[in-house]
């Protein structure tokens, strides 16, 4: 019996892939650092064993899958080589796996995770679908027709894939530690477009995506009239969003979604366009759109006393705009408070003015210290450089969150890609202690 061993199983992509292989009735195990990580929950629920790193974990007959963070000199990878066991890097293994299905890569600077989750949910209503989401969620079905997966542009990782379809949500300058500028990002997406085998579903409202050249049909979606799939007559309600879809200027159908903000409409439109292209029954699509419950760390809400607390992964100005817009739509009468932790010094420095502009759309802003990456130096930048660009912004630590209690009936959005959740946890604990 083949045993799949993951070197670095707690990585978000790695844990998702491990879940998929397990669900497909394979024997799966893995190793990693002993520090607890949020991806462990899904692995433990499935009974997948997580071991400490040890060269003795490697045995004859295993299939070794290694995360990109671990060099060839890692003790387990070295042990595999000594036993002449091939080591498959995560992206290459995933690329081979998806070739067995009708694969859909979801790419873009923003909206990948939410769109992948929505796509998988909708397609599941019509046909067996396996999926891999960048939030550490994976689901495998043995007789899958479709394989939906999130494909990240960072370090051009997505060039390991040759999918049947690609959804391209947008092209934006991010990851300034790797990409030189927007043109560098565009060229990565252009290279990806040439690897797609059947069709590309791209947001036509995005100026960069309009320039994409491909060997396959490119179907454009968006709000603009030139798009193949256009959303019109949008009703932004407190219980979701309703809109009409026109296909090449002819009315197609009216859809209701559970999401808020323009970005949620665009994500749904991409999914609707792909399903139309694959001849999935529109009634199935309509029903599945109304039952989608979202993905991890994307506008996740809870109520604490008279306040709404939202946990969101937004860490780029475009994403912050979208999250604050969604909060204003759902809670039009309430004060919106942004608690933001910048992620990496390089990104904060590159987008300093843009961060200030997007955060200013909240009624009140609190800033946590910058969450540095292990890959970078601090440089001269401090959180005060951002604070002075936002009127009334205050600094906050995980020991001073009690200041948030004064926002009676407020909507508190904790945003960031670092450890912003510890600030949220500290505040909730503060409120619970005060209640006793």
UniProtKB/Swiss-Prot annotation:
UniProt EC number: 6.3.2.8
Keyword Nucleotide-binding among record annotations: yes
Pfam family, one: Mur_ligase
Catalytic activity: UDP-N-acetyl-alpha-D-muramate + L-alanine + ATP = UDP-N-acetyl-alpha-D-muramoyl-L-alanine + ADP + phosphate + H(+)
UniProt keyword ATP-binding, yes or no: yes
Top-level taxon in the UniProt lineage: Bacteria
GO molecular function, one term: ATP binding
Cell location: Cytoplasm
GO biological process terms held by the UniProt record: cell division; cell wall organization; peptidoglycan biosynthetic process; regulation of cell shape
Role description: Cell wall formation.
HAMAP family assigned: MurC (MF_00046)
Name of the protein in question: UDP-N-acetylmuramate--L-alanine ligase
Lineage, uppermost ranks: Bacteria, Bacillati, Bacillota, Bacilli, Bacillales
């Amino acid at each position: 019996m083949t045993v799949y061993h993951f070197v670095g199983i707690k990585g978000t992509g790695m844990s998702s892939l491990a879940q998929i292989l397990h669900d497909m009735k394979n024997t799966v195990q893995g190793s990693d650092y002993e520090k607890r990580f949020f991806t462990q929950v899904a692995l433990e629920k499935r009974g997948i064993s997580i071991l400490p790193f040890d060269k003795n974990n490697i045995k004859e007959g295993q299939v070794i899958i290694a995360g990109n963070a671990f060099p060839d000199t890692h003790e387990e990878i070295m042990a595999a080589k000594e036993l002449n066991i091939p080591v498959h890097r995560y992206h290459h293994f995933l690329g081979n796996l998806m070739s067995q299905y009708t694969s859909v890569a979801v790419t873009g600077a923003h909206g990948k995770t939410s769109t992948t989750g929505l796509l998988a949910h909708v397609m599941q209503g019509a046909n067996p679908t396996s999926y891999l989401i960048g939030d550490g969620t994976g689901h495998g079905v043995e007789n899958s027709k479709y394989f939906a997966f999130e494909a990240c542009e960072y370090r051009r990782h997505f060039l390991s894939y040759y999918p049947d379809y690609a959804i391209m949500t947008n092209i934006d300058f991010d990851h300034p530690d790797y990409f030189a500028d927007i043109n560098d990002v565009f060229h990565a997406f252009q290279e990806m477009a040439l690897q797609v085998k059947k069709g590309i579903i791209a947001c036509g409202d995005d100026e960069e995506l309009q320039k994409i050249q491909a060997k396959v049909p490119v179907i454009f979606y968006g709000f603009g009239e030139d798009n193949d799939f256009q959303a019109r007559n949008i009703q932004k309600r407190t219980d979701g969003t309703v809109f009409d879809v026109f296909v090449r200027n002819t009315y197609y159908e009216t859809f209701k979604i559970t999401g808020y903000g323009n970005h949620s409409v665009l994500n749904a439109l991409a999914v609707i366009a792909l399903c139309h292209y694959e001849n999935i029954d529109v009634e199935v699509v309509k029903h599945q759109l109304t039952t989608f419950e979202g993905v991890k760390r994307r506008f996740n809400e809870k109520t604490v006393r008279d306040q709404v607390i939202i946990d969101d992964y937004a860490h780029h100005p475009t994403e912050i705009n979208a999250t604050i817009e969604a909060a204003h739509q759902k809670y039009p009468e309430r004060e919106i408070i942004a608690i933001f932790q910048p992620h990496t010094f390089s990104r904060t420095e590159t987008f300093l003015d843009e961060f200030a502009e997007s955060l200013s759309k909240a009624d009140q802003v609190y800033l946590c210290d910058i969450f540095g990456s292990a890959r970078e130096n601090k440089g001269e930048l401090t959180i005060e450089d951002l604070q002075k660009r936002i009127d009334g912004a205050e600094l906050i630590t995980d020991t001073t969150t009690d200041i948030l209690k004064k926002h009676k009936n407020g909507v508190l959005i904790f945003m960031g890609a670092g450890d912003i959740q510890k600030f949220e946890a500290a505040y909730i604990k503060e409120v619970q202690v005060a209640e006793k």
